């Protein structure tokens, strides 16, 4: 369909944190309501891009009216489910909604400015999808510590691998951009190294369970390998399936150890 999101990797970024959160904490009414709001917001992305003119003037001219209807419907569902979730959640889980709300606002601002494909736009999307696991997990009665142990591995996986994939594209887009490629490579490797150190310290001090570190390792290693030795653009599809496998492994580790 014309209004379904075109970024196939984004489907996994939505599905894996939600499924893992339910696998760890169980299904709850509040968690389901948050999930409905998230999915509706996700489905609003493509029609919003058309309405904003991000898909070109022709798409806006030919599809603008129906895209506006689709967007309005998705936003109505998202708002209704969000309000119902706020009413259902306990105070702690209700406050945790601010965690995914912050990167979501940043993503919306990036879209309005036409920068959804920028590094910060894609990073905001990755963080928004991953951090939804926090309120969904807490909605079922789990602690903040457990909720972060679910969300952090996916936040690191999605953010670092998104940057790593950008390296592959930057090497060839428009004839290649060596400076941007090198900067993105350094950023990816630095984030991976710092994240490993910080999570390790937080587990030692008891702020996070050891499972958070174990579950984060596959994604950080994968991002570092891709950043250091990026594959040819022709292998992007294979890389995509590799990231699906790593996401699955991360989910299994989280469910088995948290």
Where are these regions (language model features)?
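N-terminal topogenic module of multi-pass integral membrane proteins
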Residues: 1-90, 246
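Interhelical loop and helix-boundary elements at the membrane-water interface
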Residues: 1-11, 59-68, 107-127, 174-189, ...
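Core segments of transmembrane alpha-helices
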Residues: 12-18, 74-80, 125-132, 185-200, ...
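Helix-coil boundary and interhelical linker segments in multi-pass alpha-helical membrane proteins
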Residues: 19-35, 82-97, 131-151, 198-212, ...
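Transmembrane helix-loop-helix
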Residues: 33, 69-105, 190-230
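Intramembrane alpha-helical segments
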Residues: 79-84, 92, 96-136
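Hydrophobic, aromatic-enriched interface-forming segments
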Residues: 122-172
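A mid-sequence, solvent-exposed acidic-amphipathic segment
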Residues: 161-205
């Amino acid at each position: 369909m014309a209004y379904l999101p075109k970024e196939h990797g984004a489907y996994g970024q939505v599905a894996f944190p939600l499924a893992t959160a339910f696998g760890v904490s169980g299904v709850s009414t509040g968690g389901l309501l948050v999930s409905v709001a998230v999915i509706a917001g996700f489905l609003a992305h493509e029609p919003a891009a058309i309405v904003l003119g991000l898909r070109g003037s022709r798409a806006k001219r030919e599809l603008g009216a129906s895209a506006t209807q689709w967007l309005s419907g998705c936003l109505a569902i998202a708002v209704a489910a969000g309000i119902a979730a706020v009413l259902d959640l306990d105070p702690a889980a209700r406050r945790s909604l601010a965690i995914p709300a912050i990167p979501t606002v940043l993503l919306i601002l990036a879209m309005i400015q036409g920068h959804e494909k920028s590094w910060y736009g894609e990073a905001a999307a990755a963080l928004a999808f991953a951090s939804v696991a926090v309120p969904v997990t807490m909605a079922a009665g789990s602690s903040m510590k457990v909720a972060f142990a679910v969300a952090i591995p996916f936040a690191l996986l999605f953010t670092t691998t998104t940057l790593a994939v950008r390296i592959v594209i930057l090497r060839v887009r428009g004839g290649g951009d060596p400076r941007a490629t090198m900067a993105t490579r350094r950023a990816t490797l630095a984030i991976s190294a710092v994240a490993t150190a910080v999570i390790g310290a937080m587990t030692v001090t008891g702020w996070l369970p050891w499972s958070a570190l174990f579950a984060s390792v596959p994604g950080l290693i994968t991002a570092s390998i891709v950043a250091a030795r990026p594959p040819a653009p022709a292998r992007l599809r294979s890389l995509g399936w590799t990231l699906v496998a790593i996401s699955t492994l991360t989910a299994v580790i989280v469910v088995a150890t948290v």
